[in-house]
Regions:
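Glycine-rich flavin
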Residues: 12, 25-131
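Extended amphipathic alpha-helical segments enriched in small hydrophobics
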Residues: 13-18
Length: 131
């Protein structure tokens, strides 16, 4: 099935992210989990690799890759550290996507370059009664 869905670009991304996850993320995962820490170092390196801007238009500093590429990257990171993968996923889908999809052009120009580059981290706020 891989041949039906994965382009050569997807395979290269998968291999690169797999190596990164095993060599850079995995060694930090247990200690971060035990102390409830945020993966600052991993997020910085993910930003340097362009992973924080995978689905966003190059016009705004993203990679211009497709959603499948994003899923591949999240899956590979999630194999070694679900928390780090969740950080990337929340940044992209909850923090950045609303601006990229529904934002006015002015908002996109203002916020997406920082988010796509990973210089800023997208977040999501939720409140519930009695929380």
């Amino acid at each position: 099935m891989e041949q039906l869905y994965f382009t050569e670009e997807h395979k290269m991304l998968r291999d690169m992210v797999r190596d990164f996850a095993r060599n850079e993320v995995k060694p930090l995962a247990q200690e971060l989990d035990e102390r409830g820490g945020f993966p600052h170092e991993s997020v910085k390196k993910m930003a340097e690799l362009g992973l924080m801007g995978i689905p966003w238009d190059e016009k705004y500093g993203g990679t211009g890759m497709d959603t499948m590429a994003l899923v591949i990257a999240i899956e590979e990171i999630g194999k070694v550290c679900p928390s780090t993968a969740a950080t990337m996923m929340a940044h992209t889908s909850l923090g950045t996507a609303p601006i990229a999809v529904f934002g006015a052009e002015e908002q996109k120009e203002r916020y997406l370059p920082g988010l796509a580059s990973g210089k800023k981290i997208g977040a999501f706020g939720l409140t519930e009664p009695n929380a």
